[in-house]
UniProtKB/Swiss-Prot annotation:
It is found in: Cytoplasm; Secreted. PANTHER family: INTERLEUKIN-1 FAMILY MEMBER, INTERLEUKIN-1 FAMILY MEMBER 10. This is Interleukin-1 family member 10. It comes from Homo sapiens (Human). Keywords: Cytokine, Cytoplasm, Secreted.
Length: 152
């Protein structure tokens, strides 16, 4: 678990109350009970190297030992989990933009924009039990809205 006092843990849910969970090294959206697993507790820490007005955050899983990152692929930007400790990102141990998401509120939900690719947002898949993705979007949609439930 992340030992920094400002770390907050959340269960992040998608529009229809499906939660984020991990399986086979991927961050998926689905019903953890039906899929026989547990919702992932996501550790969130701020990226102090970017303007606070945009609410830059890191998303860590497995106690903060792995982080969600944006990578360039032939098809465009994509998401992957990397073995990078969230505390090291917070302390500024390396270039961290690709691990950073700008958190903006949309009513009671939040949208997460990739700092490395402006205009690209974390989105839920069209089908359950599929990985979270990035999508280019100008207007908010249900697929890019996530709900944060604090977890202890």
């Amino acid at each position: 678990m992340c030992s920094l006092p400002m770390a907050r843990y959340y269960i992040i849910k998608y529009a229809d109350q499906k939660a984020l969970y991990t399986r086979d090294g991927q961050l998926l959206v689905g019903d953890p009970v039906a899929d026989n697993c547990c919702a992932e507790k996501i550790c969130i820490l701020p990226n102090r190297g970017l303007a606070r007005t945009k609410v830059p955050i890191f998303l860590g899983i497995q106690g903060g030992s792995r982080c969600l990152a944006c990578v360039e692929t032939e098809e465009g930007p994509s998401l992957q989990l990397e073995d990078v400790n969230i505390e090291e990102l917070y302390k500024g141990g390396e270039e961290a933009t690709r691990f950073t998401f700008f958190q903006s509120s949309s009513g009671s939900a939040f949208r997460l924009e990739a700092a490395a690719w402006p205009g690209w947002f974390l989105c839920g898949p069209a089908e359950p039990q599929q990985p979270v993705q990035l999508t280019k979007e100008s207007e908010p949609s249900a697929r890019t809205k996530f709900y944060f439930e604090q977890s202890w």
